[in-house]
């Protein structure tokens, strides 16, 4: 369904799709091909040309207009295909690995444009294996493994559900071994790292039943100077790996 209606041929003008495998005609010129693809989406020639010049100016690629596609690098061609995907202001956008082939600068440029389209009301389906992109762009996720859906929901809710009440703490101490033993007598310490140069003891500490973050912080403050204290929240990559292992 699109807008509550079964998909019909006229709905194509409301959908933008950027496939992982790009499909530009290599012998055509950039401007010629962009105009052709825009008109396939229902745009008039004049409106397509106006919007194309807007996007080409925005991306500073106006000098590509008369180049042939086979003269462009993979990243350059991908930027053209992104433009023609969003040109007709679709309600639904489907991006399949949109950052493939981009250097970090252009990847950030496209990421910012995707976020802007989201903020302007477009619905975006984003397919990727890059979990850092999921963190940056997605509100809701579906994890698929071996063609089966294994997890679905709001990303923030899922991250809260997967957290383990573990805190990373940094302490200033000249007696790291003694302090570590003192903490271990009351809390579960999973990892420890001591830097003698600045007397910095870093610990990952998990809370037990009926123990609170305030209990831990008060205990640590009584023992040493606390340099930092933060809860460890699993990222999308951690959740993906753990979910696959559990399944």
Where is each model-derived feature located?
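Alpha-helix N-cap/helix-start and coil->helix boundary motif
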Residues: 8, 31, 131, 156, ...
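Small/polar loops that bind or transfer phosphate-bearing groups
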Residues: 16, 126, 171, 228-232
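ABC transporter nucleotide-binding domains
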Residues: 1-145, 151
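Generic structural marker for isolated residues within well-ordered, non-membrane alpha-helices
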Residues: 34, 52, 155, 180, ...
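ABC transporter nucleotide-binding domain
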Residues: 112-204
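C-terminal coupling/interaction segments
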Residues: 207-247
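Short, flexible helix/strand-to-coil boundary loops that buttress conserved ligand/catalytic motifs
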Residues: 11, 162, 244
């Amino acid at each position: 369904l699109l807008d509550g209606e079964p998909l019909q041929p006229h709905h194509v003008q409301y959908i933008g799709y950027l496939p992982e495998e790009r499909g530009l005609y290599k012998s055509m010129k950039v401007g010629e091909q962009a105009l052709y693809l825009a008109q396939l989406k229902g745009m008039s020639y004049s409106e397509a040309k106006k919007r194309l010049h807007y996007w080409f100016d925005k991306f500073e690629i106006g000098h590509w207009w008369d180049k042939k596609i086979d003269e462009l690098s993979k990243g350059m061609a991908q930027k053209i295909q992104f433009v023609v995907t969003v040109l007709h202001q679709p309600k639904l956008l489907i991006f399949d690995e949109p950052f493939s082939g981009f250097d970090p600068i252009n990847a950030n440029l496209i990421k910012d444009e995707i976020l802007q389209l989201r903020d302007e009301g477009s619905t975006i389906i984003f397919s990727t294996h890059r979990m850092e992109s999921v963190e940056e762009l997605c509100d809701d996720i579906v994890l698929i493994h071996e063609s089966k859906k294994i997890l679905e929901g709001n990303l923030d809710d899922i991250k809260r559900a997967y957290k383990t009440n573990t805190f990373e703490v940094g302490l200033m101490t000249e007696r790291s071994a003694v302090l570590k033993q003192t903490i271990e007598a009351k809390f579960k310490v999973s990892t420890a790292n001591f830097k003698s140069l600045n007397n910095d003891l870093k610990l990952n500490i998990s809370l037990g039943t009926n123990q609170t973050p305030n209990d831990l912080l008060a205990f640590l403050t009584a023992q040493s100077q606390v340099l930092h204290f933060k809860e460890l929240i699993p990222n999308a990559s951690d959740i993906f790996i753990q979910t696959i292992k559990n399944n």
